[in-house]
Swiss-Prot record:
GO terms for cellular component: ATP-binding cassette (ABC) transporter complex, substrate-binding subunit-containing. Keywords: ATP-binding, Cell inner membrane, Cell membrane, Membrane, Nucleotide-binding, Sugar transport, Translocase, Transport. This is sn-glycerol-3-phosphate import ATP-binding protein UgpC. The complex is composed of two ATP-binding proteins (UgpC), two transmembrane proteins (UgpA and UgpE) and a solute-binding protein (UgpB). Residues 4-235 form the ABC transporter domain. Its EC number is 7.6.2.10. InterPro entries: AAA+_ATPase, ABC_transporter-like_ATP-bd, ABC_transporter-like_CS, ABC_transpr_MalK-like, ABC_transpr_MalK/UgpC-like, Mo/tungstate-bd_C_term_dom, NA-bd_OB-fold, P-loop_NTPase. It holds the Pfam family ABC_tran. PANTHER family: MALTODEXTRIN IMPORT ATP-BINDING PROTEIN MSMX, SN-GLYCEROL-3-PHOSPHATE IMPORT ATP-BINDING PROTEIN UGPC. Part of the ABC transporter complex UgpBAEC involved in sn-glycerol-3-phosphate (G3P) import. Responsible for energy coupling to the transport system.
Length: 351
């Protein structure tokens, strides 16, 4: 196990197209860190730079106590798991697991020990003599993980490994990956564009945007105190409602809110908005009169899509099945402790 340190890492193509813009990050020994962001944000490029599959333009990357800028991928003591399983179709599962170890001249007894240990942990013991075409997608992904595990590397690098799986299997596999990582205690870097995967798996999240880090923290820190409007809308589903400074008063900040001078953006999450019944006092954080446009029942709760008086959308959540009707006018509010205020530059200004 080893820590991974990135110090002002940059990557440019053609000398003037910079895709990684001075990223600095320290990943602790045994930590599970998820790089998350939209397509094109640089997360896979950054992972490939750690792996040595992409050169770096400037800065340093260290794995353990060793700077690996000029170290070949095979010598970095890392193991990668990709979106495509990359299994040899003519080999059995056992042979796929053993292949890399044989190339490294690992003793036969040690190979068998590692295969047995990985197969037991991944529950693929009964598949060892099968070939990849005889396995399901989830089983193939387990074999791909097993091939990484038998390496006993200093770090695991995962590049969107669950993208090819259906929704139910993705949920199962993300739990298995996290359980396995905890039992092995191996430093892990995981790339995904799926914020649900990121939130449920990470010890810490790294949100990337256009080649730079927007925010680093635990999932709950990023959810409760997003550092920018970008993080606020990317983390959480449905995303946070963001309202610009009102010109014609389609909504009102509550009495407990102090607003910055100049332009600002006001944020409130759907679950923090409540319907105010007749006779209820205004909320101390946020108030608005809205028209209901659509209701989504998603099991134990409903999401109500509404419109402010200026036509801007507002989404809020209610428990159970909503009894409200389309085109109904309702008054909504939120507590001051649940609102988020961002300055004109999009950065957080509220505590």
């Amino acid at each position: 196990m080893s820590k991974i340190v990135l110090d002002n890492v940059r990557k440019s193509y053609g000398g003037n197209i910079e895709v990684i813009k001075g990223v600095s990050l320290e990943i602790a020994d045994g930590e599970f860190v998820v790089l998350v962001g939209p397509s094109g944000c640089g997360k896979s490029t950054l992972l490939r730079m750690i792996a040595g599959l992409e050169s770096i333009t400037s800065g340093t990357i260290s794995i353990g106590e060793r700077v690996v800028n000029n170290v070949e991928p095979a010598e970095r003591d890392i193991a990668m798991v990709f979106q495509n399983y990359a299994l040899y179709p003519h080999m059995t599962v056992r042979e796929n697991l053993a292949y890399g170890l044989k190339n490294r001249k690992t003793p036969k007894e040690e190979i068998e020990r590692r295969i047995a240990k990985a197969a037991k942990a991944l529950e693929i013991e009964q598949f060892l003599e099968r070939k990849p075409r005889q396995l399901s997608g989830g089983q193939r992904q387990r074999v791909a993980m097993g091939r990484a595990i038998v390496r006993e590397p200093a770090a695991f690098l995962f590049d969107e490994p669950l993208s090819n799986l259906d929704a139910k299997l993705r949920v199962q596999m993300r739990v298995e990956i996290k359980r396995l990582q905890r039992s092995l205690g191996t430093t892990s870097v995981y790339v995904t564009h799926d914020q649900m995967e990121a939130m449920t798996m990470a010890d810490r999240l790294v949100v990337l945007n256009a080649g730079h880090i927007e925010q680093v923290g635990t999932p709950i820190e990023l959810y409760e105190k997003p550092a920018s409007t970008f993080v606020a809308t990317f983390i959480g589903s449905p995303s946070m409602n963001l309202l610009q400074s009102p010109e014609s008063a389609p909504w009102q900040p509550g009495r407990a809110i102090t607003l910055p001078s100049g332009g600002y953006t006001f944020g409130v999450r759907p679950e923090d908005i409540r319907i105010l019944e007749e006779g209820d006092q205004d909320a101390d954080g946020f108030n608005a009169q809205v028209r209901i446009e659509a209701v989504e029942l998603v099991g134990a709760e409903s999401y109500i899509h509404a419109a402010l008086s200026d036509g801007k959308p507002l989404i809020f959540r209610v428990a159970g099945r909503s009894t409200h009707n389309i085109d109904e006018m309702v008054r909504v509010g939120a507590s001051a402790t649940d609102v988020h205020i961002f300055g004109a530059d999009g950065r957080r200004v509220s505590d």
